[in-house]
Amino acid sequence: MQKLKQQVFEANMDLPRYGLVTFTWGNVSAIDRERGLVVIKPSGVAYETMKADDMVVVDMSGKVVEGEYRPSSDTATYLELYRRYPSLGGIVHTHSTHATAWAQAGLAIPALGTTHADYFFGDIPCTRGLSEEEVQGEYELNTGKVIIETLGDAEPLHTPGIVVYQHGPFAWGKDAHDAVHNAVVMEEVAKMAWIARSINPQLNHIDSFLMNKHFMRKHGPNAYYGQK
């Protein structure tokens, strides 16, 4: 697990590097599907002092199998998503400013241009709010459940992120680094959407044919963007 712990550590260190976290407001995890184990940032440990060996390994029930610290408080959310969507290899949660603002507003991040369409096939959805019973009960588990309720059976890698109402953004990818990459993009397109709608409140969504072109040329069966 040392290699995966190193990858998760590096991905976590990318969060402050890209300006996605303040203090310890975020974390990254990744899963080893063959072993059924998840590596995640320890709860509340400062990035300045954190080491790869500080990463915590849990099984799919959340039991710590390796590590001296408690795992992130978001562990139950991540495990619920890993169980439901086998294509996910890494997940990240932050409170990045602009994506969190859309979450607090209770609004999906609208697909307004090609930067968005290169990564997200449609709006980045916003979940419903959790009920008082859901919050007072198994809060983190129920956060995962409301994300799943919103995504349904859609391929999560086609829209690799979501904003949880009154909470903040979650993003995911094929591995930990891909998840962070998508979280960075989500924050940028959230900022772009806010600015664009401020300039033109009547701005419409990106044309569907342009959305399809930009997404499919990178992610479709006949993708031709980038190098093989």
Swiss-Prot record:
**One term of GO molecular function:** aldehyde-lyase activity
EC number(s) per entry = 5.1.3.4
Record keywords: Hydrolase included? Answer: no
The alphabetized UniProt keywords are: Carbohydrate metabolism, Isomerase, Metal-binding, Zinc
The note on the cofactor says: Binds 1 zinc ion per subunit.
GO biological process: one example: pentose catabolic process
Q: Which InterPro entries match?
A: Aldolase_class_II_sugar_metab, Aldolase_II/adducin_N, Aldolase_II/adducin_N_sf, UlaF
Q: Where, by residue number, does substrate bind?
A: 26-27, 43-44, 72-73
Sum up the protein's function in the record's words.
Catalyzes the isomerization of L-ribulose 5-phosphate to D-xylulose 5-phosphate. Is involved in the anaerobic L-ascorbate utilization.
The molecule here is called: L-ribulose-5-phosphate 4-epimerase UlaF
Q: Tell me the organism.
A: Shigella sonnei (strain Ss046)
| Upper lineage | Bacteria, Pseudomonadati, Pseudomonadota, Gammaproteobacteria, Enterobacterales
